[in-house]
Regions:
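Membrane-embedded transmembrane alpha-helical bundles that form the catalytic cores
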Residues: 1-166
Length: 166
């Protein structure tokens, strides 16, 4: 039992790191090629796995896409200017759109909904969440992201549930 739990945690953690290293590595190559041609590209990652909350994670991960969704989806919807309920709805819409953007599959849509719900929950409960020690919040954030990334790996929602139940 303990071996299978350790195996499960190890596999999922490695997949989280694989996604980061693959994507961040591609960005690093693009930065290098850009510098060769005297083109400075915007930073796209800022140590996302050091994030202390899911909101902090999304401020650090794929920052150019986050800026795009903020500018062209969140702000036109009203951003946070129309009250808390509308803000929460706007956050959910942005993450839903992000899920669809990543792929036309229910796994990506569920990934967007889960991340949107986590962001909304953090906004609602941040007063209490911020009392948790920083290192524990970092661990919780990493575990959540690892859980959510499994939806990228799964071919179907049913397969994702199988992965989560192992």
């Amino acid at each position: 039992m303990i071996n299978s739990i350790g195996n499960c945690i190890s596999r999922r953690s490695c997949y989280s790191l694989q996604i980061y290293f693959d994507f961040s590595g591609y960005c690093d190559m693009a930065y290098g090629i850009g510098y060769m041609f005297n083109v400075e590209l915007p930073v796209n990652f800022n140590s996302p796995y050091k994030a202390v909350s899911i909101v902090d994670f999304w401020d650090r991960w794929h920052m150019t896409l986050t800026r795009f969704f903020t500018r062209y989806v969140y702000i036109p919807l009203g951003g946070s200017r129309r009250g808390k309920i509308r803000t929460y709805l706007n956050v959910m819409i942005v993450f839903f759109v992000s899920g669809v953007w990543h792929g036309a599959n229910w796994t990506f849509i569920l990934w967007g909904i889960i991340n949107g719900a986590a962001n909304v929950a953090h906004k609602i409960f941040s007063k209490w969440i911020d009392r948790i020690p920083k290192v524990l919040r970092m661990g919780i954030t990493f575990v959540f992201c690892t859980f959510a990334w499994s939806l990228f790996r799964a071919e179907s929602v049913a397969q994702a549930f199988e992965l989560w139940n192992r």
